[in-house]
Amino acid sequence: MVSSFTSAPRSGFYYFAQGWKLVSQPGIRRFVILPLLVNILLMGGAFWWLFTQLDVWIPTFMSYVPDWLQWLSYLLWPLAVISVLLVFGYFFSTIANWIAAPFNGLLAEQLEARLTGATPPDTGIFGIMKDVPRIMKREWQKFVWYLPRAIVLLILYFIPGIGQTVAPVLWFLFSAWMLAIQYCDYPFDTHKVPFKEMRTALRTRKITNMQFGALTSLFTMIPLLNLFIMPVAVCGATAMWVDCYRDKHAMWR
């Protein structure tokens, strides 16, 4: 099926919504199963454990609030909960993406072929296995780019006042951008676009990608819905690639 997508770019919210529609397309569902299973097992177990620990973690987090901000505690409490969910959700979604990276790449490749009518390389299961070292190297590049920035933001959480007010907002913006990079990278990587070139391309449509990443980040925090977010985000990012980036960066047509 050739896509009815136009070359005119839409908002990041649009592409996120498209992800939910595309994930259930006939012929695509079988490529969704493995990423979905990885996400359900890892994110489901991780968030179940998290919710058993919140009554310990949140009071500890709130103990860093200085006395002069105690009058804002009724506002800072939900911010503390959101902060824990953001950091925890992003950490475990990163692990899930590492494990499912080869299958996410295959999903992006097959969906792109369906949307455009193009013929992808005939990889098959053996081609995927052969490509695993390169895919893992790509995931490592993302991790190395992300880690020092994440550490700086996490340090802010331990600064009284800033850690309970400014840091959660900065972390949300950072995780939105990083999740846009994470999921948009799959269709870019199927065309062997270098990591640095991919980041440069995303910056040309930064608002669109921040919108997409922000919704992905929010849904990663929501129990049950976050179990399905990985394949949905891959599909949405692939739709964005087809509309916004494919003409310039595609290796196969």
UniProtKB/Swiss-Prot annotation:
This is Sulfate transporter CysZ. Belongs to the CysZ family. The chain crosses the membrane at residues 31-51, 75-95, 151-171, 222-242. GO terms for biological process: cysteine biosynthetic process; sulfate assimilation. InterPro entries: CysZ_sulfate_transptr, Sulfate_CysZ. The gene is cysZ. It is found in: Cell inner membrane. The keyword Flavoprotein does not apply. The lineage of its organism: Bacteria, Pseudomonadati, Pseudomonadota, Gammaproteobacteria, Enterobacterales. Keywords: Amino-acid biosynthesis, Cell inner membrane, Cell membrane, Cysteine biosynthesis, Membrane, Sulfate transport, Transmembrane, Transmembrane helix, Transport. Disulfide bonds: none annotated. One of its GO terms (molecular function) is high-affinity sulfate:proton symporter activity. It comes from the Bacteria. GO terms for cellular component: plasma membrane. It is a multi-pass membrane protein. High affinity, high specificity proton-dependent sulfate transporter, which mediates sulfate uptake. Provides the sulfur source for the cysteine synthesis pathway.
